Design a protein with these regions (language model features):
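Interaction-mediating elements
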Residues: 1-126
């Protein structure tokens, strides 16, 4: 029997989560109810951010977003664990970009390395 599973993350900010998903080319919807894929008999789940009718993120009691999806009917070509890693990396990128901007800096250059690390060069005129 199929059911919605959750995968915990350390993601805490909704705006950066949405930006990260959009950078990864996902169509993002807010405040949606996930539906039972293939008419499986499990309860509907309300999520804060969704990227389809059966995949989303909801805020848990620890103030962190968790991925909610029916893993048995996962359609994305990227496996769930790798998907969370990619979203987390883009979330970190957006968080750093937003903090840099708040501090008055500007990103001059950005590189994604072969090992998937990201390097930035930032400047600020004083």
């Amino acid at each position: 029997m199929s059911h919605f599973s959750t995968i915990r993350t350390k993601i805490k900010n909704k705006p950066e989560l949405i930006e990260a998903l959009q950078l990864l080319q996902y169509d993002v919807q807010e405040d949606q109810e996930l539906i039972n894929p293939l008419n499986h008999q499990h309860e509907k789940v309300k999520v804060d951010v969704s990227i389809g009718n059966d995949i989303g993120f909801r805020l848990n009691n620890n103030g962190e977003y968790e991925l909610v999806a029916d893993i048995q009917t996962w359609k994305d070509p990227v496996p769930p664990k790798r998907f969370v890693e990619k979203v987390t990396q883009q979330y970190a990128r957006m968080t750093v970009h937003n903090q840099i901007k708040e501090m008055g800096f500007k990103v001059e250059e950005e590189w994604e390395m072969d090992d998937n690390t990201i390097e930035l060069t930032v400047t600020r005129w004083v």
